[in-house]
Amino acid sequence: SDVCSSDLHFRRRNRRGYREVKQQLLRDQHGLCAYCEISIKLAEFEDNVDDFRVEHFFPKVATQFEKHNYHLDWHNLLGVCHGGSQPYVSDPEWRYSSRKNDRSCDVPKGGKPISERILNPLKIPASVRLFRYQEHTGKMIVDESSCPKKLQAKARNTIRELNLNAPRLQRMRLALIRILEDEINSALAGGAVLEEFLPLLAESILLPDEDGNYQPFFSVARWYLGEFAEDILRENNYAM
């Protein structure tokens, strides 16, 4: 289509401009994929590919059928990972999967007209936690105790349509849960008081680093650390 070809032409003619768009999205999203929250990994070597691309939340093709030009709308642009589909990213043994059912984010979404049925990452309220996770599998589930009722259907659709329970993502989330468990167990073994240690852990895990980036799978850590996480986020005026 004309819309898709214009995007390709923009990238070819203006590589610096496209790079600047990516860098701004990277800053706006604190270094995380807008859908799965894996860290955005830029290429380390010449033969690597950035695990990062620009996604149009409302598909570019929608511009052809509606008055709004989604193609050029900054608020329609998201920075996302390759969803496990790109073998030439850094850390491919961790980030790439040859199996179709292990692909996530905008890979299964494609140009399907589902934008009205899933959560728009730019409009998710920062003040509430929408998801919880199974501690022994890393599986993502809508948290009915904290996710607003009006968002629960969209939240479920988001997990399903973007395949956010791909085995690859569950494995990564489980790795973070294990790290948090180990940190807590080590602290307790060293004589720490849980109520004093957990706020410190929440602060170290949930606040942005010196580059303004969040830890990957931020929402997993937020869920795992419970009220200690919410207290730290409130104190620091969290609004992702």
Where are these regions (language model features)?
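Short, flexible, mixed-charge glycine/proline-rich loop motifs
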Residues: 19-29, 70-73
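C-terminal, charged low-complexity interaction regions
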Residues: 141-240
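Short cysteine-rich clusters marking metal-coordination/redox-active sites
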Residues: 33-36, 81
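Long, low-complexity, intrinsically disordered segments enriched in glycines and aromatic residues
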Residues: 95-150, 158-165
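Histidine-centered nuclease catalytic patch
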Residues: 40-104
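Short, small-residue-biased leader/transition segments that mark boundaries at the very start
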Residues: 2-5
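Hydrophobic N-terminal alpha-helices or hydrophobic patches in metabolic proteins across all domains
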Residues: 39-50, 164-165, 169, 206
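Short Cys/His-rich Zn2+-coordinating modules
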Residues: 9-22, 55-66
